[in-house]
């Protein structure tokens, strides 16, 4: 595990302990059972593919450790509706506060504003966080293989699947991919950003994507800014993209989302 992830795990463990004191697991489980049913994250992505379109997971992201504040006028419901209008298939909402200035309330508000399925984008270290995600309405959670051993990843995945949620399994090298393929979830996210150096290159996806079985659903993450980037990754059968920063920096998020996806729409028109 990188030094960055080790520091994150330390503060997440403190957060989890405090949350368990404030809301015991039994109470959280009751809230999760009463939450609105999961909307089907993977289903929404595959529906876009079936229509011949790229599938966009659009990220609601206020800040990041490497870039600082990304969007000052940060309004999750407004941004969520803008993404939906622009053609996004799903949403990703940062809920980590220390590193990303995120919050669970942002996810709740974004989901309530749209009909799109929502990923709780956070660092998962404990199954308590999975139940917490479902209790707040999440449709999907993230597993970062670089942050977990195999047993912990399997436990967190099982808790999510048992709750009716989907799981995005994130990897950024061959060893993590081999471990991820032992899990049950179809979604494999290839993070083009090295978590140790923060260097970002689409070559990471290009080298790893051909190693993933065809029945899996590949997601390209990080370093994706233009229609040309989408086209480049589509050459290695990546048809789903998680994009945040480049869209969050735009004044007109709906127009920017449409523009990002426009090449695919143009290609579809040309083929008709």
From Swiss-Prot:
Which GO terms are recorded in the biological process aspect for this UniProt protein?
L-tryptophan biosynthetic process
Q: Which PROSITE patterns match?
A: IGPS
UniProt-listed CDD domains: IGPS (cd00331)
EC no.?
4.1.1.48
- Reaction catalysed? 1-(2-carboxyphenylamino)-1-deoxy-D-ribulose 5-phosphate + H(+) = (1S,2R)-1-C-(indol-3-yl)glycerol 3-phosphate + CO2 + H2O
Q: In which pathway does it act?
A: Amino-acid biosynthesis; L-tryptophan biosynthesis; L-tryptophan from chorismate: step 4/5
Query: NCBIfam families given for it?
Result: PRK00278.1-2, PRK00278.1-6, PRK00278.2-4
**UniProt name for this protein:** Indole-3-glycerol phosphate synthase
What species is this protein from? Bradyrhizobium sp. (strain ORS 278)
């Amino acid at each position: 595990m990188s030094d960055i992830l080790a520091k994150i795990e330390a503060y997440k463990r403190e957060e989890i302990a405090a949350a368990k004191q404030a809301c015991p697991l039994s109470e959280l489980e009751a809230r999760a059972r009463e939450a609105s049913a999961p909307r089907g994250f993977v289903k929404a992505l595959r529906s876009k593919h079936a229509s011949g379109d790229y599938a966009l997971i659009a990220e609601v992201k206020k800040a990041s450790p490497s870039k600082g504040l990304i969007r000052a006028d940060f309004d999750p419901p407004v941004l969520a509706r803008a993404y939906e209008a622009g053609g996004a298939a799903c949403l990703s909402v940062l809920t980590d506060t220390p590193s990303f200035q995120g919050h669970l309330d942002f996810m709740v508000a974004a989901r309530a504003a749209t009909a799109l399925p929502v990923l709780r984008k956070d660092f998962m270290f404990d199954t308590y966080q999975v139940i917490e995600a479902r209790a707040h309405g999440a449709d999907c959670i993230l597993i970062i293989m670089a942050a977990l051993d195999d047993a912990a990843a399997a436990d967190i995945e099982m808790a999510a699947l048992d709750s009716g949620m989907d799981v995005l399994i994130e990897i950024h090298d061959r060893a993590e991919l081999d471990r991820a393929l032992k899990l049950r979830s179809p979604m494999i996210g290839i993070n083009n950003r090295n978590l140790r150096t923060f260097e970002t290159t689409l070559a990471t996806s290009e080298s790893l994507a051909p190693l993933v079985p065809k029945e899996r659903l590949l997601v390209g993450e990080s370093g994706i800014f233009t229609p040309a980037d989408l086209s480049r990754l589509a050459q290695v059968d990546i048809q789903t993209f998680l994009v945040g920063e480049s869209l969050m920096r735009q004044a007109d998020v709906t127009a920017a989302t449409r523009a990002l996806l426009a090449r695919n729409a143009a290609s579809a028109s040309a083929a008709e």
